[in-house]
Amino acid sequence: VDSRGMILSRSHNIKEKNHNPCGHAEILAITEAAKKLNNWRLLDCSLYVTLEPCPMCLSAMIQARIGTLYFGAYDPKGGSLSLNYNFYKDQKLNHAFPVIGGLRHFECSKLLSSFFREKRTNYNKN
């Protein structure tokens, strides 16, 4: 979302579908937004995600210089902000941005649980 509130890109995880370990929604959304703006720096842009980003995605956000990150559910297993070593707090990083997490945590957690339960059910049918 840009500084005027316009949605620049939307995405979802295509890691399994495309057999691409980098096919996370955040990476795809950042890439598309940068293309639309014709600029890799997304300083005045905000990123909204359902689940706390993994270290790879948080690294991409730092590289893209995003303005603000908003996320719903925390991910204690793989979330880059919930891990014991939160590299985001490392003072050596060249960019920092506000992170607002836990937004509608219950709803986001429920949405993700339902989504993955359905995927497992469909996978077991095949």
Feature roles, as predicted:
Residues V1-E16:
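RNase H-like nuclease fold core
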Residues I14-L28:
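A short, polar/charged loop-to-alpha-helix boundary motif
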Residues L8, I27-I30, Y70, F116:
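Conserved protein kinase catalytic domain
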Residues W40, P53-N126:
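Zinc-dependent deaminase
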Residues M6, S46, T68-L69:
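Structural motif
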Residues I27-I62:
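Helix-adjacent hinge/juxtasegments
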